[in-house]
Amino acid sequence: MTSLTLALDAMGGDHGPHVTVPAALRALKSHSSLKIILVGDKTEIDVYLRQAEQPLLSRIEVIHTDEVVSMSDRPVHALRTRKNSSMRLSIELVRDGRAAACVSAGNTGALMAMAKVLLKTLPGVDRPALVSCLPSVTQKPVYLLDLGANISCDSETLFQFAVMGSVLCEAVDKKSRPKVALLNVGTEEIKGNDQVQQAAQILQNTDQINYTGFIEGDEIYLGNVDVIVCDGFVGNITLKTSEGIAKLLVHQLKRGLTQGFFVRFLAKLIAPRIQAVLSQMNPDHYNGASLIGLRGIVVKSHGNADETAYLQAISLAVTEAQRRLPEMIKDRLESILLDINN
């Protein structure tokens, strides 16, 4: 790939440089043309760079700051007062063109507020959306948005989310005409509130979006559609509930496989298969939520992500930057609006 630079908020998340720096080094090993700017406390960062190979160090830059956005900071407070924080400086690197994308595991609300103010939304986009992919029984990812950036949305905003989600799926998975659905309380045309009903009407009349209709919550993981659209209130609860169920299933499976000698013996025989199933259910395997609809790329990692999970978020940022995701969304929106106006 051509040379690409990412900005990492090295201090963000529960583990800070203990996770972000080793993950950055692993990303550099995987992508020979990648450069990374680590933003944070240089003293702490250097601890994890001491044993790194020189060829990797030559592709790392450290920008020092000892200011951090805490998980308890309110978004408005962080925006007004944390002007030299590792999170803000990372986003500013994207704004100023020094980095193609930013990755942070820090305070989600603060990240969204800073990104929206510093990067601005694309033409035709009223609000950015937070989107991530979920597993499915067909082994293909399903994209769900919005995950909490916008608690309530009107029909036009839901329509914009559908367009952005469709373009994201095309860009990341190289999927032609992804299937898009609206999350609803039923699949019948009469079901749903006014916002969902009106969004459905707009999508039905938009040829450039492969809209398939409504989808219910029990169909999310079947893999029958590629993109599922809802407001941030519904999306966030759906995501958190899904993660909780995954943890419950993993716990119950592990508990069941340790009860009794014969069961433990069988568990050892099928251990590789069990591990593969557990891996598919692990939310860390799908770590990385994209804040789309902005003039730059911002990827949010889980705050408690380990090194491998954080690496997944970095890889997502690399892919979106390579595909020039903001430009793709901008072009598609312009094309759709042109069709509607004609």
Swiss-Prot record:
Its EC number is 2.3.1.274. One of its GO terms (biological process) is phospholipid biosynthetic process. It is found in: Cytoplasm. It catalyses: a fatty acyl-[ACP] + phosphate = an acyl phosphate + holo-[ACP]. Disulfide bonds: none annotated. Pathway: Lipid metabolism; phospholipid metabolism. InterPro entries: FA_synthesis, Phospholipid_synth_PlsX-like. Belongs to the PlsX family. The keyword tRNA-binding does not apply. It comes from Shewanella sp. (strain ANA-3). One of its GO terms (cellular component) is cytoplasm. Homodimer. Probably interacts with PlsY. It comes from the Bacteria. Keywords: Cytoplasm, Lipid biosynthesis, Lipid metabolism, Phospholipid biosynthesis, Phospholipid metabolism, Transferase. It holds the Pfam family FA_synthesis. It is an enzyme of class 2 (transferase). This is Phosphate acyltransferase. Catalyzes the reversible formation of acyl-phosphate (acyl-PO(4)) from acyl-[acyl-carrier-protein] (acyl-ACP). This enzyme utilizes acyl-ACP as fatty acyl donor, but not acyl-CoA. One of its GO terms (molecular function) is phosphate:acyl-[acyl carrier protein] acyltransferase activity.
